[in-house]
Regions:
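Extended, low-hydrophobicity, polar/charged segments
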Residues: 1-155
Length: 155
């Protein structure tokens, strides 16, 4: 088991969540992940990381799989212009590789925002620390454990 997967598993357990973690193979899109899990695309919780242009810190947006983050809304929420986060920043600040960024278990907890549309489902699926693993949990629990703020930031 990878260090990242162990860290996510530990974070979920410490939060009192008994989640099913599945190895689904390498999915490069939310639609591929949804097809492999057998759920709707919007039940896939994507963890999108931006870099604060002023602070240089990672800022996490947890969004429904079929949605796109609106850069203007995201910047307004963050209170600073946002830019693309490169692989080095993501790995250094979250501890995850691109494609495996989980909403929980970060090395350093980023500011995080949670897409309201995820609350429409009984269960959502999110990366579990690797591009090949996901965990399923009620969206309210993912919101709680992630420490994210509920917000509107998608188009």
């Amino acid at each position: 088991m990878s260090k990242s997967l162990k860290r996510v598993t530990r974070a979920l357990t410490e939060a009192g969540l008994d989640c099913l973690i599945q190895e689904i193979g390498h999915a490069t899109t939310a639609q591929m992940a949804a097809d492999l899990v057998g759920c709707e695309i919007d039940q896939i919780a994507k963890s999108i990381i931006f870099a604060g242009s002023d602070t240089g810190t990672a800022i996490l947006f947890i969004t429904a799989g079929g949605a796109q983050v609106d850069p203007a809304c995201a910047s307004a929420l963050a209170g600073e212009p946002l830019g693309k986060a490169d692989a080095a920043l993501i790995r250094t600040q979250t501890g995850f590789a691109i494609g495996g960024v989980s909403p929980v278990g970060h090395l350093s907890a980023p500011r995080a925002y949670f897409d309201r549309r995820l609350l429409a489902f009984d269960q959502i699926w999110a990366a579990a620390g690797t591009p090949r693993h996901v965990f399923g949990a009620p969206p309210g629990e993912v919101l709680r454990v992630s420490g994210a703020e509920l917000a509107d930031f998608t188009v």
